[in-house]
Design a protein with these regions (language model features):
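RecB-family 4Fe-4S metal-dependent nuclease core
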Residues: 1-181
Length: 181
């Protein structure tokens, strides 16, 4: 990352998982960061520079895919946290229905983060999505709009968040070099 004409900063990290999906001239990118503890994507924390990692990973993944697929338009589909755990379900109600157990486990393992608000992308990410996803932080109201609890971004907002994080990384890098840690 270029901080000035004389100064550059290199970030080193490892993206846990990158999934891609090609459709005609488009390449959709999903980034997943595995976490041992529960983590939600928080735009306020991002604004203050406290939660930049997931967006930095998405920026790096998009850049890598653009270099590898110059003939495709690379589009961020989702950036997600996956809580690695062994979920427990409540079975105090007698003999539980196997489907209820499966649904409870999926709810416990549901990823958090940000997902594209484009219907086509959501369908690619969750083929069973109708009104509420079992794996993504996305649900729709009866009128077809997203619920307030849904974590969705338009492509324009993905770019705004991406640009902001790039700016914030440069700002923080310059502060570190100036001794303002």
């Amino acid at each position: 990352i270029t901080l000035s004409e004389e100064e550059k900063m290199r970030l080193i990290g490892r993206i846990d998982r990158i999934d891609t999906c090609e459709r005609q001239d488009k390449l959709y990118v999903k980034v997943i960061d595995y976490k041992s503890g529960y983590r939600r994507f928080d735009l306020a924390a991002l604004y203050y520079g406290l939660q930049l990692q997931l967006v930095v990973y998405m920026n790096a993944a998009v850049e890598m895919q653009q270099k590898a697929h110059r003939d495709k338009k690379v589009i961020p589909a989702a950036m997600l946290y996956y809580h690695v755990s062994d979920p427990m379900t409540d079975t105090d109600k007698g003999q539980p229905d196997p489907q209820e157990i499966q649904d409870a486990i999926l709810e416990e393992l549901k990823m958090t983060g940000m997902v594209s608000d484009e219907e086509e992308i959501i369908q690619l990410l969750d083929k069973d999505f109708t009104d509420k996803s079992k794996v993504l932080p996305v649900a729709k109201k009866k009128d077809g709009s997203f619920t307030q609890a849904s974590s969705v971004l338009s492509q324009e907002d993905f770019h705004v968040v991406s640009d902001y994080v790039n700016h914030k990384i440069r700002e923080l890098g310059s502060e570190i070099l100036a001794g303002d840690i």
